[in-house]
Amino acid sequence: MRKIVHVDMDAFYASVEQRDDPSLRGKPVVVAWRGARSVVCAASYEARIFGIRSAMPAVRAERLCPDAIFVPPDFTRYKAVSRQVREIFHRHTDLVEPLSLDEAYLDVTHAKTGMQLATEVAQLIRTQIREETQLTASAGIAPNKFLAKIASDWRKPDGQFVIAPSRVDAFLLPLKVNRIPGVGKVMDGKLAALGIVTVADLRQRPLEELQAHFGSFGQSLYRRARGIDERPVEPDQEVQSVSSEDTFSEDLALDALAPHILRLAEKTWLATRRTERIGRTVVLKLKTSNFRILTRSYTPEQPPTSQEALAQIALALTRRVELPAQTRYRLVGVGLGGFSDVENGAVQGQLFGQMPPLE
């Protein structure tokens, strides 16, 4: 039986800002550029009390908490701290799969320290992070990645939670289905319309029914409802692509997708900045009302150097969609692929310097 730990830094970017500037401690801090189309990168726990969350439009965050302190993100500092944390992980196992600067999966089945209990490994890792970075992390311990990720949210901030193999059903079945990664508001509503509110409800539905309603995602739902996730922890896997998607509550015409594409371009650009890598290929993904998926991509001579450039290419790709005008779409996604490392400071400044607003 595998022993998987999911470690997630607590309000990472905001916590780094509060650590480095004592005047920010205990105050609602929002890490974001100011601007009509900017989104929140991170919010301190003091800001979250007001309902502010990551990926929320910055203007909405200002309305929710007029006294919030907005701090522009500094990814160079965040990446330096992330390297510190990753070095701590590698003291315990070489099977480390980073998901972003602030979270990772670890397979500690055969920990380097010889420790047998995954809970003790997780506790030691969290203690070392606190002592060496003055930041806190939360951890989930479980037999697979899916369950470990859910568990890491259970005792946030600065806590850990274990789902023992013998307790998987007892933990999983009472959960609301929106606790399953990938089940957002729209999917949650569609499941509720079918009478599926909890994981126990979901488990009662046959695979064929879920696939009929949700296509390939139906199989994922079927497996997650049973706590099944056989994905291995893939050590230090380099990010090859980044994307953001929106599923609509009502199907839309192609010419109604532009506002969504603009917003998704910003989310994708922000996620790209977190990797500090260059994405060269722009990808537009669409799903029609009858679940047909199509993608269009374009690789310019020079990689996009701003969210505006990314958005304009994605918008242009809609003109390559050759379906009848009456076709309606239930999902749109914007992605960047073909990643390579940022090689020098000049290129990094050009790509990841000031983020211009989309007009």
Swiss-Prot record:
Gene3D superfamilies: 3.30.70.270, 3.40.1170.60, 5' to 3' exonuclease, C-terminal subdomain (1.10.150.20), DNA polymerase, Y-family, little finger domain (3.30.1490.100). SUPFAM superfamilies: DNA/RNA polymerases, Lesion bypass DNA polymerase (Y-family), little finger domain. It catalyses: DNA(n) + a 2'-deoxyribonucleoside 5'-triphosphate = DNA(n+1) + diphosphate. It is found in: Cytoplasm. Residues 4-184 form the UmuC domain. One of its GO terms (molecular function) is magnesium ion binding. Its main location: cytoplasm. GO terms for biological process: DNA-templated DNA replication; error-prone translesion synthesis; SOS response. Keywords: Cytoplasm, DNA damage, DNA repair, DNA replication, DNA-binding, DNA-directed DNA polymerase, Magnesium, Metal-binding, Mutator protein, Nucleotidyltransferase, Transferase. One of its GO terms (cellular component) is cytosol. Mg(2+) binds at D8, D102. Belongs to the DNA polymerase type-Y family. Monomer. This is DNA polymerase IV. It comes from Xanthomonas axonopodis pv. citri (strain 306). The gene is dinB.
